[in-house]
Amino acid sequence: MWSDPIADMLTRIRNANMVFKEYTDIPASNLKKKICEILKREGFIADYKYIEDGKQGILRVYLKYKGGRKNRERVIHGIVRVSHSGRRIYVDKDHIPKVKNGLGIAILTTSKGVLTDKEARQLGVGGEVIAYVW
């Protein structure tokens, strides 16, 4: 059986977001921390925190919503894994996708680290498309 830790992370965030949870816990890794940093910087999550558990650690991701308690709206409308173990999706600097005509972001792993589509365009690097978030 194959496992995809990044797809698991995105699914946990998507599921918690759908039921308006305050936070969700995810097994930690360096790549997941970098993805959380991008989501926080771009305003899709409120915050994240690393919790030491004696093993690999846990990332507690605090989700973000608009509005009050009664009329809450989700900030994350969609989060999708693009490249996975069975089908890797690589793009060069000239073919970096725009998500929802610029309203969302694409998260890429590049030679310069984990970047958004805008950052990768500015640096002129391509890479593997991890996920789309809008």
From Swiss-Prot:
A GO molecular-function descriptor: structural constituent of ribosome
Residues spanning the signal sequence: none
Keyword set includes RNA-binding: yes
Keywords, comma-separated and alphabetical: Ribonucleoprotein, Ribosomal protein, RNA-binding, rRNA-binding
Source superkingdom: Bacteria
Presence of keyword RNA-binding: yes
GO CC annotation terms, alphabetical: ribonucleoprotein complex; ribosome
Any GO BP: translation
HAMAP family associated with the record: Ribosomal_uS8_B
Function according to Swiss-Prot or TrEMBL: One of the primary rRNA binding proteins, it binds directly to 16S rRNA central domain where it helps coordinate assembly of the platform of the 30S subunit.
Record text on subunit structure and interactions: Part of the 30S ribosomal subunit. Contacts proteins S5 and S12.
PANTHER family: 40S RIBOSOMAL PROTEIN S15A
Annotated family: Belongs to the universal ribosomal protein uS8 family.
Protein name: Small ribosomal subunit protein uS8
Organism expressing this protein natively: Thermotoga petrophila (strain ATCC BAA-488 / DSM 13995 / JCM 10881 / RKU-1)
Source lineage: Bacteria, Thermotogati, Thermotogota, Thermotogae, Thermotogales
